């Protein structure tokens, strides 16, 4: 009887355990909002030394971060890279070696730099003998302007392309980083921003890099009133709720009337100062869970283009301040770094995940040869789950599982700096389906990856040309709006109509030294429903002449385009295309760049991805790489071959007579363009 009772008890416990398992369903074929783009970068202070840079900056490679923010801290002459402005107020000299060393090293691993120009250099301080003198307004604004121009010329000479300059850092934090007023800051911006653009016309300039959200509107008002360059607003948040910053920036930018202007969160940590001290939660395993918990909200803001996580290496000089991803003393990656690393291992195309109950949270993503899912547990109780992944796009591979919790992959608790996989075994994919059971400890993370046996690098560096600037477009600054996002590392554009049936997703890639042929490979998810007369899914190249003006453009489409479309782009020639070419398959064709270039072409183009009024819920990716002329099909027409002819003048408008540009569509689906003279 006793033995029977023990068996019954065991069965009861197994039943309860099975009932307690959370069901997790991942559908790899259903893309979801929002893509897991790698816009979460890092913020590095000047509270470092060269030894730490050499030791820890190479670790950036594993994070797949697309930006690093660096605060120069001029006037704080005891910090790294300072003083970089020497001489006198009338005759400044410069010592940029250390600053350039840090930024060049960062640029090796992050495509974009965000450089904060500030504070007042010692030669312009009203209290040069006092440590707090850096907070004061400059004594000579002409020299302040010249210094900013000189910095920008330095960034240009070092080829810090596709990058940003902030004017000052937290000027609204009274007696923390600035002793002046709002009007004083606006004058600082007014004298610095135009000088930055004069020194480096391709760089983006903005501010106010606010600790609070009070000064965004005033900066936009001043920029609009004076015609000042303002490419972005930036702000900071320490604590979980960053919505106040984003809402204030969006409201101010709506009044600015510049749909290209971006939002940057250039310092962010979900922890308050009381929580990021030594031995606090920021150092422990739970920081990984907190990192993932913060991501969905940030990803849901397409017009938030960069987030600089505070901080990369623990800041020196402040013994109790330990909010870095890297331990300053040992160089050991913390749990927070490992969470970043796992996020970098996730494909960008997000897919559907459904999690039972109301405790566990998660995200999933898919590529042709890789599927990942991350599940995190905000509760104080361990959770078990059973995960089913369906529509896996490959047949064989390896199943791997990582945990971050107080027993694994958290340096603070374990004092082990290695990054260890918990489980690795052949995947058992059956009918595109894989099942597994696992667990997530209290405030922990569980990461699942199934990788094809033929998997390639997830985010390979594509060396197609030099990206000098990315043109964003946000006509509707809401989370529901259409968007287009560009990854400069992989040369991939991800577009979505999101919840807008008649929205406009647009992004322009300004680049130099492109090859003569560009291979385009695309992928679409969702059903298109064309609306109105300006619908489109197309690519366009605008060519710049030696005068610096864009003088010629050619548009490529696969049938989702009206010849009578009147929409003009906000960049490039700013008119309808000069040439319109229909291709067989927009998801697989070659752009003959050299074939269309004007005689006075200087080597710079803007490659634009354009998707408009094609219904809600449609996603389109384009990936660009170097192509070959073999991908072009332009047969010579013969009798009986021609299916349709359409004539255009050189502004791209359709004509009814044989003069101008003729697009010939053949019965085999190929196209040919012919110039027909008068």
Go through each PLM region and give its residues.
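Substrate-binding cleft and catalytic face of glycoside hydrolase catalytic domains
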Residues: 63-240
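Short carbohydrate-recognition loop motifs
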Residues: 482-502
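C-terminal outer-membrane/trafficking sorting elements
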Residues: 633-678
């Amino acid at each position: 009887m006793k033995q029977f009772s023990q068996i019954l008890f065991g069965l009861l416990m197994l039943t309860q355990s099975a009932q307690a398992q959370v069901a997790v369903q991942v559908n790899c074929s259903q893309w979801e909002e929002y893509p897991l783009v790698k816009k979460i970068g890092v913020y590095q202070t000047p509270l470092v030394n060269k030894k730490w840079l050499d030791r820890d900056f190479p670790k950036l490679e594993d994070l797949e971060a697309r930006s690093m923010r660096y605060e120069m801290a001029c006037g704080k002459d005891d910090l790294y890279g300072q003083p970089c402005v020497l001489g006198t107020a009338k005759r400044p000299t410069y010592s940029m070696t250390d600053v350039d060393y840090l930024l060049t090293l960062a640029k090796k691993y992050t495509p974009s730099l965000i450089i904060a120009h500030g504070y007042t250099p010692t030669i312009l301080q009203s209290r040069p003998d006092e440590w707090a003198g850096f907070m004061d307004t400059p004594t000579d604004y002409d020299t302040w302007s010249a210094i900013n121009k000189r910095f920008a010329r330095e960034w240009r000479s070092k080829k810090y392309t596709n990058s940003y300059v902030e004017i000052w850092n937290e000027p609204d934090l009274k007696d923390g980083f600035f002793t002046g007023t709002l009007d004083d800051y606006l004058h600082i911006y007014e004298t610095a921003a135009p000088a930055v653009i004069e020194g480096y016309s391709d760089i983006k300039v903005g501010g106010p890099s606010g600790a609070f959200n009070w000064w965004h509107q005033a900066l936009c008002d001043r920029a609009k009133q004076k015609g000042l360059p303002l490419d972005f607003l930036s702000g900071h948040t320490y604590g979980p709720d960053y919505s106040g910053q984003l809402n204030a920036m969006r409201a101010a930018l709506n009044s600015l009337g510049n749909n290209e202007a971006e939002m940057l969160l250039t310092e962010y940590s979900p922890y308050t100062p009381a929580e990021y001290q030594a031995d606090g939660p920021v150092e422990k395993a739970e920081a990984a869970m907190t990192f993932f918990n913060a991501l969905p909200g940030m990803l849901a803001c397409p017009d938030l283009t960069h987030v600089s996580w505070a901080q990369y290496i623990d800041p020196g000089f402040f013994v109790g301040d330990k909010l870095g991803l890297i331990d300053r003393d040992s160089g050991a990656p913390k749990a927070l770094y490992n969470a970043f690393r796992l996020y970098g291992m996730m494909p960008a195309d997000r897919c559907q995940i459904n999690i039972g109950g109301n405790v566990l949270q998660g995200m999933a993503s898919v590529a042709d040869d890789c599927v990942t899912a991350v599940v995190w547990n905000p509760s104080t109780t361990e959770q078990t789950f059973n995960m089913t992944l369906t529509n896996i796009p490959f047949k064989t591979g390896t199943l791997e599982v990582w945990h971050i919790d107080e027993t694994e992959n958290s340096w603070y608790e374990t004092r082990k700096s290695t990054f260890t996989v918990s489980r690795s075994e052949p995947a058992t994919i059956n009918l595109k389906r894989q099942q597994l059971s696992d667990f997530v400890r209290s405030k922990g993370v569980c990461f699942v990856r199934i990788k094809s046996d033929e998997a390639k690098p997830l985010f390979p560096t594509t060396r197609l040309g030099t990206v000098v600037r990315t043109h964003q477009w946000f006509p509707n600054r809401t989370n529901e709006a259409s968007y287009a996002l560009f990854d400069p590392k992989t040369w991939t554009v991800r577009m979505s109509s999101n919840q807008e049936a008649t929205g406009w997703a647009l992004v322009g890639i300004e680049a130099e030294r492109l090859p003569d042929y560009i291979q385009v490979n695309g992928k679409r998810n969702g059903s298109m429903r064309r609306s109105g007369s300006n619908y489109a899914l197309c690519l366009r190249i605008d060519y710049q002449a030696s005068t610096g003006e864009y003088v010629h453009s050619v548009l490529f489409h696969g049938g989702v385009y009206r010849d009578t479309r009147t929409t003009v782009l906000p960049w490039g020639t700013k008119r309808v295309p000069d040439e319109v070419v229909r291709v067989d398959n927009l998801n697989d064709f070659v752009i003959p760049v050299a074939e269309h270039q004007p005689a006075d072409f200087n080597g710079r183009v803007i490659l634009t991805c354009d998707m408009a009024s094609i219904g809600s819920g449609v996603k389109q990716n384009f990936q660009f790489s170097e192509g070959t002329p073999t991908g072009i099909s332009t047969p010579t027409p013969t009798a009986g071959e021609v299916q349709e002819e359409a004539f255009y003048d050189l502004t791209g408008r359709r004509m009814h007579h044989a003069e101008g540009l003729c697009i010939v569509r053949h019965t085999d689906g190929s196209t040919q363009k012919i110039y027909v003279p008068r």
